[in-house]
Amino acid sequence: MYIKQIRLKGFRTYKNETTIDFTRGINCIVGFNGSGKSNILLAIEFILSDVCEYKQIYLHEGIGNAVRNCYVEIIFDNSEKYFSMFKESEIKIKKVLENMKCEIFVNDKNISKNQYVELLESCGLCINNLYNIIKQGQIIKLSNMKDEEILNYLKSILGAKIFEEKKKDALSMLKECDSKKVTIEKEFNDMNSKLESLQEEFENFLEYKKLEKEKVHLDYFLNEINYKNIYEETQMLKSKLQELKNKTQDEDNHLNLSNNNKSEYNEKLNKMKLEIASCQNHLNKTISEDIQNKRNIVHLQMLIDEKIKEKNIKESQNKNRIKNINQINEFILRVNEKLQSLKSDIVSKEKQIENKNNEINMLLSKNKNKNTDANYSHNVKKIEKMINDINIELSFLEKETIKNEKYLKELEEESKVLNKSIKENETLSQKYGSEINELNNKSEKCVEQKRQCQQKISEGTTNLNEIKCQIIEVNDKYDEIIKSSNKEILKIVDLIMAEKSIKRENILGFLIDNINVDKTYVKAVDTILENHYFTLIVEDMQTAKKIVEFIEKKREERTSKEFNFKEFYFGKLTIVPLLNIKKFNEFNYPNDKNIVPLIKCVNYNSKIYEFLKNILFKTIIVKSLESCENYLEDNYNCVNIDGDYLSKHGFMYGGYNKKKYGIYTVYNKLKELKEEEKKEKSHIEELNNNIEKIDDELRNIYDTKSSTVAKKNGCASTINSINNNIYSNEENIRLTSEKINYIQEKKQNLEQHKDQLKMQILQLRNNNVNPDESEKVGSTDINSLNDEVKKLKEELNKIRNEYDDFKNKLELLYQKRNENDSSIYMEEYEDVDIDEYNNDLADKKDHSDKIEKEKIHYEQKIREINKEMENVKSSIDKILINEKKHKKKILDLCHQMNQINEELRILEGKEENIRKKKVLLPQGIQELEEYRTYDKQQLSAKLKSVTMELKKYSNVNEKAGDRLNILMNDFNELKKRHEEINSSHKNIKDMIQHIGKKKDEALEATYVKINKYFSEYFSLLFKNRKASLVLKKMNEKEYKEKLQEMSEKRIKRRIIDEEVYIDKITGISINITSNDDEKMTYTIQELSGGERSIVAICLFLCLNKIDNFSFFFFDEIDAALDTIHRDNLSLLLKELAHRGTQFIITTFRKELLEYSDNMYIVKIVDRESYISKGTKNEAYEIISIEEKHALEN
């Protein structure tokens, strides 16, 4: 095992992170003085020691920011498995000082200090004495040690201190044994003297006991006579009491019968009330439904009326529209007929023009050779004029075509827009359709929610009726139990709580509202706190005064009015201001299983603790009142779980109680039921509100649905109107395209005619044809024909214009007819809505009739139940009168029974006292026969004489016998303890001797091992000399003298084996001999300083063999050596390095550098150290500079 690497940061002079890689062999660190060489060895010591506390000296102190933390990390080679618990070939140990804490990490895992110590000790590292780290001055210190000091040093390395500590512990135990033996002997002497005096006292005690037994017998017989007399008296009283009980039982039976009858009638009455309540609820429900239904009917009727009015108006409008449509259809027929006739005229005119043109052409061809020059120019001009007219007409037709094409484009664009709007309206109608479906689903959900709410309301009403029935039952019990004054107190407190001038937060309420009691202790608490339940608790005196002023004010208001029995206030309100209550000291109740403090059985508001403590002070719950006489002597008030009470003044009340439930139970039950009723009512009210909200939502849904349907219908009508527009637009497109085609045909005809005229001119020019000479050849005149053609064309134009006008009129008629059709189409949808409303109205009216029948049924049922209730109440009143009579009789009988019970209680007290005395008679003692014949006077005289004799023994020690037995037991225990101490004394001696032997054996074995290597290493360092270690021991004479000296100093009373206290090994000396003369020996003190340092180094190297360490750390080991010794030491270290030992050395000498395997140069800049690997030349330069500085100084 050796150190492979050291990494440190913030440690001493090494501020920045520094890494140093080491190898096996000799590693030399060289640097100037104060550069930080020794800090590397200090870092190794910091890791290998158990220092885990925060120390400021380890932190770097330099220029710049202060360093708050540091760490040192060492990587060990574990190839030889020194750290046997780790399988890794390298072990990384790291210590970190941070935030005033030290943390240890092994292979990056945090461990505790104890685990770390165990880890180091497992691989042989002694953390308390690191003798393989040799600092400056440590070699000189060892070389100057005496023989005893060397021995102690070896012991500390070996761990012999553990033996010394064990030896000291054993010696202290031995001293304790001696002191205990002395005390036991003293106790023996004291016990003997005490035993003699107790023997006399015990004899007097026996005589006293005889007389006391006789007195007990006399008391016993006297008590027997008294007990018989009291027993006879009690039997007489019990027989009278039994007679009275029988009478009361008879009366009680009559009372129970009447109660049973009353409870039956009350049950009937409650059932009737419940039926009335349920009928009333159903009636209210039907009334509310009827009102709602009527509202809906009115609403629907109004809607239907409005729709019918609108329908009538629209029907009248439709009639006019139908008339208009019929008229339009007639006009359309006429126009179509007219158009047909015009079309036929146009065709006939065009044929006539064509015929005339043909005739002209024929004439021109016939008269080719007969034209004169005079008419030629005239005819040409005419034809050219005709051509000009045709050109004018062609230009006009061209404009018309452009105009019609432009109009056609506009119509096409308009059709695109209309198609787009159709798509938009279709999407809108689909959207409105989906919205209508959603509204339908929503309305169905709302109807379902309404049905569920109505079902919950019916369930809630049944629960409310049950709660009301329970309230009636509990209220009856409440009226029986609670006084009328308390009821009036509750009323006045309600008025106080409603008063604004009194702060409500200062009023805590009644005592019964501020406590909570378990069922087990309810009867006991009722007995004690019954008269305090309706005490009003307030915070301070000011609030109490305001309440009193308010009550007085109310009284004055009532006195000013006429007397009203119902409003008169009977009760007296008790008010307790908490701040004015006197506070008592805390009282500790006795720790007894048979009692429970009553205040611990009550859970209460912490503010009323002092008030409760005043009421329940020294009040306890006991199992039975018979066992509470001892507590009455200590002024405790006792009460049992059944509510029987015995006060500290001796007053007792309780016994048989017919009430099954007390005030607390009934009051809280009534309170809970009222809260439940309130919750149920609020729940029903909430459900009704939900139903109203659902109805409003349904109305909104129906309104939105009708508006959405109207929108959808509007979309449908717009789609229809757009379709009509598209149809008319398409018709216009068709007509315009026809018109354009017609114009094109006309243009072609005109072009043809123009070409013909041009041909005529050419013919005239070529042949000198004169068309005007037709009369000469016997044909029609060309001019007259041309005139006719012109007239025909004018007529044709007129007919065509008329045709276009009629066509435009036809389009307008079609448009009007489509508009009327769309309006009639919309009214069909509105008729469907009216039918739906009529169906809803019919259903509502049927439902209204059903509700009216239910109303009549429930009203009749309520009247019948009220009649039955009056009969039941009259019978209950009769039963109450009989009950009062029976109760009076029972009260008289109870009064007589109480008197007899009081007499019996006195007799029973006397009987109990006698019974107690009888119980106190010692068991196992036979009754004396002579006292059986004595009467009461003889027994009392004998008792007097015995008591006089007992007075003589008034000072007798009654505990003498007990003390004698105790003393004998103590005496036997002392004997046992004496024997145990002797055996332990012997065992301790044996243990001390065993420890001494073990220590000596370990020392001798270590000495043999060290001596061998010391001689070997010394011979390598001093070639002409030999050395050995000598173990010094005492001889017998010296041992006895030492024994005597120790015994005189300690002044022991008896002889002790002093081998326990004295070590026979006194020291280790070093004997040196010369090879030339072996008889001549030297000690270490006779050597020079350098030689002694070499011997000390040799001894240090030998100590390595104790734990087989494989590394050493020397700080300037060769400082005090001359050149020869440094050479020899270097050779020795080189030899040990070859054997596997690692050396890390700081030095200023060149000799060690010759044999070193690695050189490390340390430099310091601005109080920060830096280390790096260097060469021998660099190291020599640093050493030479240091030597020069040393010579100069």
Swiss-Prot record:
What biotechnology does with this protein, per the record, is: Possible candidate for an effective malaria vaccine as determined by epitope response in sera.
Q: How does it get modified after it is made?
A: Acetylation at Lys-101 by ESCO1 is important for genome stability and S phase sister chromatid cohesion.
In its UniProt entry, what is this protein called?
Structural maintenance of chromosomes protein 3 homolog
Identify the coding gene.
Answer: PFD0685c
Report the main location listed first in the record.
nucleus
* UniProt KW DNA damage keyword: no
Residue span, SMC hinge domain: 505-631
The written remark on domains in the entry is:
The flexible SMC hinge domain, which separates the large intramolecular coiled coil regions, allows the heterotypic interaction with the corresponding domain of SMC1A or SMC1B, forming a V-shaped heterodimer. The two heads of the heterodimer are then connected by different ends of the cleavable RAD21 protein, forming a ring structure.
Q: Output one GO BP term.
A: mitotic sister chromatid segregation
Q: How does it assemble?
A: Component of the cohesin complex.
Q: Which Pfam families match?
A: AAA_23, SMC_hinge, SMC_N
- According to the UniProt entry, which residues carry N6-acetyllysine? 101
Q: Binding residues for ATP, per the UniProt record?
A: 31-38
Q: Give the molecular function GO annotations.
A: ATP binding; ATP hydrolysis activity; double-stranded DNA binding; minor groove of adenine-thymine-rich DNA binding
List, alphabetically, the InterPro entries matched: P-loop_NTPase, Rad50/SbcC_AAA, RecF/RecN/SMC_N, SMC, SMC3_ABC_euk, SMC_hinge, SMC_hinge_sf
> Which pairs of Cys residues are joined through disulfide bonds in the record?
none
**Family affiliation:** Belongs to the SMC family. SMC3 subfamily.
What role does it play? Central component of cohesin, a complex required for chromosome cohesion during the cell cycle. The cohesin complex may form a large proteinaceous ring within which sister chromatids can be trapped. At anaphase, the complex is cleaved and dissociates from chromatin, allowing sister chromatids to segregate. Cohesion is coupled to DNA replication and is involved in DNA repair. The cohesin complex also plays an important role in spindle pole assembly during mitosis and in chromosomes movement.
Q: What stretch or stretches form a coiled coil here?
A: 179-286, 332-483, 665-993
SMART domains assigned: SMC_hinge
Name its cellular compartments: Nucleus
Alphabetic keyword roster: Acetylation, ATP-binding, Cell cycle, Cell division, Coiled coil, Mitosis, Nucleotide-binding, Nucleus
Q: Does the keyword Coiled coil apply?
A: yes
Q: What is the lineage of its organism?
A: Eukaryota, Sar, Alveolata, Apicomplexa, Aconoidasida
Q: Which GO terms describe its cellular component?
A: chromatin; mitotic cohesin complex; nuclear chromosome
